[in-house]
Amino acid sequence: MIESDTSSIMSGIIRNSGQNHHPSPQEYRLLATTSDDDLPGDLQSLSWLTAVDVPRLQQMASGRVDLGGPCVPHPHPGALAGVADLHVGATPSPLLHGPAGMAPRGMPGLGPITGHRDSMSQFPVGGQPSSGLQDPPHLYSPATQPQFPLPPGAQQCPPVGLYGPPFGVRPPYPQPHVAVHSSQELHPKHYPKPIYSYSCLIAMALKNSKTGSLPVSEIYSFMKEHFPYFKTAPDGWKNSVRHNLSLNKCFEKVENKMSGSSRKGCLWALNLARIDKMEEEMHKWKRKDLAAIHRSMANPEELDKLISDRPESCRRPGKPGEPEAPVLTHATTVAVAHGCLAVSQLPPQPLMTLSLQSVPLHHQVQPQAHLAPDSPAPAQTPPLHALPDLSPSPLPHPAMGRAPVDFINISTDMNTEVDALDPSIMDFALQGNLWEEMKDEGFSLDTLGAFADSPLGCDLGASGLTPASGGSDQSFPDLQVTGLYTAYSTPDSVAASGTSSSSQYLGAQGNKPIALL
């Protein structure tokens, strides 16, 4: 049989291989001299082994040689079929199914092909022969030539080698994205400089503190927190804050209660008298450009709170101080208006009304010029002693001992009812320095004859000083005897001057003395 003949031939070759590593060409032809009729059809193609360069064929099988290249000669179709049989093993050959040691060492190509069978068989995927090797006619078609320069397994490798790992294509896109985030963190939102003055910003910080006083460092922190412009602004703004604290009278330095601890430096607080002024200034800028203020703030919704809030220390002293100021002002006004001359050690006594009638007293005296008998002025200020009505009869002498006391306690009456009836009285009463003027002009008790032998009365009936009605029972309630005398001008001299100063009634020669209240 064929197997026995082949075995005998191979055994002879093996025996001679130990003596000669390079057998003669006759030994190569032993495989080809076998009759074609005795061999099966698949073994007839083995005749190409004597004429084909096996190393060249190995390179083509491994994919290192481009079969479609113009410089490579086209191999015999039988050679490709033999390669397919050797690598894939679809139709096993009796010659190659023997042990590996049966292959003659001196036969070029057989040994290397058998040794490389396992290593070359790993290229076909899944242990199946490629379509190009099974179908030789399609190998030379133009459409299938690009599939053979590289094996299927090798075609998957170049993309990885050229472009790196699967994520190698993506880094150019995420890297700019990350750079954008980092740039945003390094360059935050731009905040413009607030339109508020430094004094307003300092006042905001002090008004929104717990105690109403802060050190300079905490004022800095407040401004940077609520107005981020100062986070990146040059350090010159801190000098401006310190200058405002030192020079602006709206701020005052207070004692640091924690001076005994490690904290050093002074505290600054708002001047309570100027808090309202600062708040008004803040509201003015808010009305002027609210949008600009909001753009400069980290939290624009807190603006109203920063302007209006006050600490407890700024509220408490203001409430009791408000009623005190009007009281003091009223007392001062009353003292100046009344021109009080009363000695504080003396007991209080009723005030007396000082009335000087400026209208001329003659036969045609107008009723409006006199106070009505039922006027409240005499009732409100009763005289120190009972006074009789004026009459043509002489008046009694006053008590000499009580005159000085009465004079000391005389003060002007600010009764609005009396002033409304007689404007001349108002003019006289509002002169706060009246007594100083009288003193400069020589007004004294001695010159006026208050305690001298002056007439005790005047003949009013003879001089015609009675009212126009002629009734003897009527009197002049505005002329009362109090122990103080002065001189009154005659009707002729008074008629020429309407309302005049007090010097016109005092100390003139030829004037008739009359009694004053």
From Swiss-Prot:
One of its GO terms (molecular function) is cis-regulatory region sequence-specific DNA binding. PANTHER family: FORKHEAD BOX PROTEIN N3-LIKE PROTEIN-RELATED, FORKHEAD BOX PROTEIN N4. GO terms for cellular component: chromatin; nucleus. Keywords: Developmental protein, DNA-binding, Neurogenesis, Nucleus, Transcription, Transcription regulation. The gene is FOXN4. The keyword Nucleus applies. It comes from Homo sapiens (Human). This is Forkhead box protein N4. It holds the Pfam family Forkhead. It is found in: Nucleus. Its main location: nucleus. Transcription factor essential for neural and some non-neural tissues development, such as retina and lung respectively. Binds to an 11-bp consensus sequence containing the invariant tetranucleotide 5'-ACGC-3'. During development of the central nervous system, is required to specify the amacrine and horizontal cell fates from multipotent retinal progenitors while suppressing the alternative photoreceptor cell fates through activating DLL4-NOTCH signaling. It comes from the Eukaryota. PROSITE patterns: FORK_HEAD_2 (PS00658), FORK_HEAD_3 (PS50039). InterPro entries: Fork_head_dom, FOXN2/3-like, TF_fork_head_CS_2, WH-like_DNA-bd_sf, WH_DNA-bd_sf. Residues 365-398, 497-517 are annotated as: Disordered. Disulfide bonds: none annotated. Residues 193-289 bind DNA. The keyword DNA-binding applies. GO terms for biological process: amacrine cell differentiation; atrioventricular canal development; heart looping; positive regulation of transcription by RNA polymerase II; regulation of DNA-templated transcription; regulation of heart contraction; retina layer formation; ventral spinal cord interneuron differentiation.
